[in-house]
Amino acid sequence: MEQIVEKIREVAKRVLGDEVYNALPPNYIEVSPAPKDTGADYASSAAMKLFGQMKSSGAATSETIKSPRDLAETIKKLVEEDEGFPFSIEIAGPGFLNFISRDEYWKQILAKYSDNFAENISYRVYSDKQVICEFSDPNPFKVLHVGHLYTSIMGESISRLVEFAGGKVIRANFGGDVGLHVAKTIYALMKKDLKAKDLAKPEDIGKISLCYVDGTRDYEENENAKEKITELNRLIYEIADAGPDKIYPDNTYPKEVAELYWAGRTLSYKYFDDFYARVGVKFDKYYPESTVAKRGKKEVEDHIGTVYEMSNGAVIFPGEKYDLHTRVFINNEGLPTYEAKDVGLIFTKWDDYHFDQSIVITGNDIIDYMKVVLCSISQFAPDLPARTKHITHGNVRLPGNEKMSSRKGNFIKAVDVLDEVEDALGNLGKTPEIHKISIGAIKYAFLKYKIGGNIEFEAKESVSMTGNSGVYLQYSGVRAKKVLAAAATAKRAERTTEAPEWKLNQYEKSLIRELDQYRLVLKEAVGELAPHKVANYLYDLSQEFSRFYEHSKVIGSDWEKERLEIVRTYLNVLEHGLNILGIEIPEEM
């Protein structure tokens, strides 16, 4: 399409003159794939826009250019003077330019991708930039639910988009290893007389999950329990601050709490690591809240009176002054809240990496919360919020559209989703490839939707071999691999006549045209940090490949070499795009 745009620009300058042409905004001349019912390959409304620009600028129109269609006819005539231009032009309606390609054009496109695929899709907008991608952010002492699965998959794909664009990505994970949720869990563990030794095996994470629900219920319904949990919360901050090597007197309350705390914390992080390994995510840096809380509290305290204010024994940020809402950063017990910990996090990230950009991916229920936190920091360290991009996603809901809650215990565990999809693929058998297929199905099911809205996940739909699914794309990739493998071992009779000239059929043209869109899709996906752009493109591309496969014999045809190159290029694009989504193509399906 760039070739058409450049040619229209060249002609427009001749027709309009330098003064009018130079006043045109950037990207004023646009070309896009033509609607299928036109019979053209590309289309442009440039003549109509340029004619309007001529009139509004007061430029004189000639005797032969009195309408947009006249201008379109002039552009057509001047463009077609170039015999090397690989398109014929038809005028439609009031002045649409429809471009119909010659075979030579598609051969050039195919050769371009075949000769240097990586260079032709390159888009290094993040080159030499250090970017922190923070995502997933589960809390120790809680079980991972399907929402964590979603944000882990989305965060990994966004990280890969930035890496494709040349960025040095640090994958970061921020989680609450201190706070009321920990105190509630430990209170319930102690109530059930569970000890540190009872939190040693991977399956013991279930005990933590149940105790969090029980502890939350006690906190909300029992005043005596609430007082004890509040005191536990204060003690846990001290235990976390002292570290795991502090020795407490035997048979004391602090020792029992410390042992439970460190055993539960260790079990939680091991559980997280196992889960992330299963979904193909590896974090470079964990930021437990206990490691940033002090820094956040200090930054807040250092700016009391200038940014933050005292209110009833607590420290607040008066958000109403900035058309936001007021939030507490240090509570009246002197403990830093989530807000202060986020302040500490952004400064700790900066100390560690001096990032060019920090991308934070969370649920959209904390949009307003993050606005307050970042606004408060911008009053005394404006560069850090300016470098921070907050991307939010919707909730994962249970049947009946009820939001999941680990407090209530009515949530879908992340591992249950993984297991359910593997079960749905049972007809494929428990092969080594089953994991690639199942995790690919889940990733695609999440990533094909634009980030921001709510997600409803159906296991059976995600493993469909015919619909818009990851399994369909993987199967298409396996099919392409098999064609190339068969070609490598096929026995061919020696040709006795010269092969006829390769005249592309409509399926070859359509597939090559779709392949040529990939670099543009990547630019959009990187610019918007939008994996769904890649996912939906790959589905459209694979449908084109399916039509090509059905109607274009490859092995043994007169144009086997050329068609194998189409298959090879398709596989390159598919593998590259699926890699951005974190999906692998299995060898067999």
Where is each model-derived feature located?
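Non-catalytic interaction-recognition regions
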Residues: 1-107, 118, 125-589
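Short, charged, solvent-exposed linker or helix-capping segments at domain edges/interfaces
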Residues: 108-113
